[in-house]
């Protein structure tokens, strides 16, 4: 079943795949990485003027990485603002997604955190560098195949 945003994207011939709705009724749309800049601008023009959150996660060990954007259409006197969830899957061998910092400035720290923890490179981001981990850190801590360096398990003496 297509939601309002998916219908609108189809009318404007923007490539996407409807993925249903979450438990709150928020429409989920999956897109390809290369289509993200044009779809982001189109959604901003459509009225999604607020990036509520952005996150990244490892779908499964050895599988895809996902970057998820939650967009909200803020309007005056709106009790129930319209929301949409955009999901982008990328390969872990070359995890690259165009940054949407230039559309929603609030993506700055959120994309940096996703880069720092999951290793997704947000192309054309103005300050893409580690934000939580030291610059010397090796690897991406939130990937399911990550091995903590120099980890020693403490055992009970009893």
From Swiss-Prot:
Its EC number is 7.1.1.-. Signal peptide: none annotated. InterPro entries: NADH_DH_suC, NADH_quin_OxRdtase_su_C/D-like, NADH_UbQ_OxRdtase_30kDa_su. It catalyses: a plastoquinone + NADH + (n+1) H(+)(in) = a plastoquinol + NAD(+) + n H(+)(out); a plastoquinone + NADPH + (n+1) H(+)(in) = a plastoquinol + NADP(+) + n H(+)(out). SUPFAM superfamilies: Nqo5-like. One of its GO terms (molecular function) is quinone binding. The keyword Transport applies. Keywords: Chloroplast, Membrane, NAD, NADP, Plastid, Plastoquinone, Quinone, Thylakoid, Translocase, Transport. One of its GO terms (cellular component) is chloroplast thylakoid membrane. Its main location: plastid. GO terms for biological process: photosynthesis, light reaction. It is a peripheral membrane protein. It comes from the Eukaryota. Gene3D superfamilies: NADH:ubiquinone oxidoreductase, 30kDa subunit. It is found in: Plastid, Chloroplast thylakoid membrane. Transmembrane segments: none annotated. The keyword Cytoplasm does not apply. It is an enzyme of class 7 (translocase). NDH shuttles electrons from NAD(P)H:plastoquinone, via FMN and iron-sulfur (Fe-S) centers, to quinones in the photosynthetic chain and possibly in a chloroplast respiratory chain. The immediate electron acceptor for the enzyme in this species is believed to be plastoquinone. Couples the redox reaction to proton translocation, and thus conserves the redox energy in a proton gradient. Belongs to the complex I 30 kDa subunit family. NDH is composed of at least 16 different subunits, 5 of which are encoded in the nucleus. This is NAD(P)H-quinone oxidoreductase subunit J, chloroplastic. It comes from Psilotum nudum (Whisk fern).
């Amino acid at each position: 079943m297509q939601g309002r945003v998916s219908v609108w994207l189809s009318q404007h011939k923007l490539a996407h795949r409807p993925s249903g709705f979450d438990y709150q009724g928020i429409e989920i749309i999956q897109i390809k990485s290369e289509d993200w800049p044009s779809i982001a601008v189109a959604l901003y023009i459509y009225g999604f003027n607020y990036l509520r959150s952005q996150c990244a996660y490892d779908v499964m060990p050895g599988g895809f990485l996902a970057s998820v954007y939650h967009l909200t259409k803020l309007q005056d006197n709106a009790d129930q603002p319209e929301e949409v969830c955009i999901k982008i899957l990328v390969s872990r061998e070359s995890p690259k997604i165009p940054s949407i910092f230039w559309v929603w400035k609030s993506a700055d720290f959120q994309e940096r955190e996703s880069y720092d923890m999951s290793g997704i490179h947000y192309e054309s981001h103005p300050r893409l560098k580690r934000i939580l981990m030291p610059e010397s850190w090796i690897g991406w801590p939130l990937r399911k195949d990550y091995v903590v360096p120099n980890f020693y398990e403490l055992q009970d003496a009893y």
